[in-house]
Amino acid sequence: MRQFIISENTMQKTSFRNHQVKRFSSQRSTRRKPENQPTRVILFNKPYDVLPQFTDEAGRKTLKEFIPVQGVYAAGRLDRDSEGLLVLTNNGALQARLTQPGKRTGKIYYVQVEGIPTQDALEALRNGVTLNDGPTLPAGAELVDEPAWLWPRNPPIRERKSIPTSWLKITLYEGRNRQVRRMTAHVGFPTLRLIRYAMGDYSLDNLANGEWREATE
């Protein structure tokens, strides 16, 4: 299993809570970093029920309610019903490095599933499973304790009293639509809660849910 070393020097320690930012520029911005503009990297711990974008015609919660920074865009997606690390930047090359399939950038997820996965199920995840859009790459998959840093979700997950739950640490090297959820369902253990902890060299690193901070490239 590929190991990740997250450097504390990668990130600045100043964090911000900005839950009610009421103004955000509507001016269209290119995803290419303008010349002479320094690279900005924002790490955000996305709460549940927040879209990974700055606008939404349906009036749902978006990034603009939390991040008052213009000209940055999410590197990859993190679904509305998922939580955790979202990396935003104005640097297109960095976005590509984090998200393009050929780069094989590792992404670490902590996943609460229904039931207790068997060794056969874990081996299937590690070796790759065949989904409706083709076989997945081999992945890291291990049964772990509930993370000590875990925050309460609002609203809580729906649990069935007769069925236990457990936590997996899953490392992917690709990024298909709702891939983790589809993989755990494929081996018989549906995902109840999904938190992305790390993406390449960036991690949550004690960043509170709903907060953001600047990092270096």
Swiss-Prot record:
This is Ribosomal large subunit pseudouridine synthase E. Coiled coil: none annotated. Pfam families: PseudoU_synth_2. Residues 19-38 are annotated as: Disordered. Belongs to the pseudouridine synthase RsuA family. Its EC number is 5.4.99.20. Gene3D superfamilies: Alpha-L RNA-binding motif (3.30.70.1560), Pseudouridine synthase I, catalytic domain, N-terminal subdomain (3.30.70.580). PANTHER family: PSEUDOURIDINE SYNTHASE FAMILY PROTEIN-RELATED (PTHR47683), RNA-BINDING S4 DOMAIN-CONTAINING PROTEIN (PTHR47683:SF2). Keywords: Isomerase, rRNA processing. It comes from the Bacteria. The active site is at D79. Responsible for synthesis of pseudouridine from uracil-2457 in 23S ribosomal RNA. One of its GO terms (biological process) is pseudouridine synthesis. The keyword Isomerase applies. Residues 19-28 have a biased composition (Polar residues). One of its GO terms (molecular function) is RNA binding. The lineage of its organism: Bacteria, Pseudomonadati, Pseudomonadota, Gammaproteobacteria, Enterobacterales. The keyword Isomerase applies. It catalyses: uridine(2457) in 23S rRNA = pseudouridine(2457) in 23S rRNA. CDD domains: PseudoU_synth_RluE. InterPro entries: PsdUridine_s_RsuA/RluB/E/F_cat, PsdUridine_synth_cat_dom_sf, PsdUridine_synth_RsuA/RluA, PsdUridine_synth_RsuA/RluB/E/F, PsdUridine_synth_RsuA/RluB_CS, RsuA_PseudoU_synthase, TruA/RsuA/RluB/E/F_N.
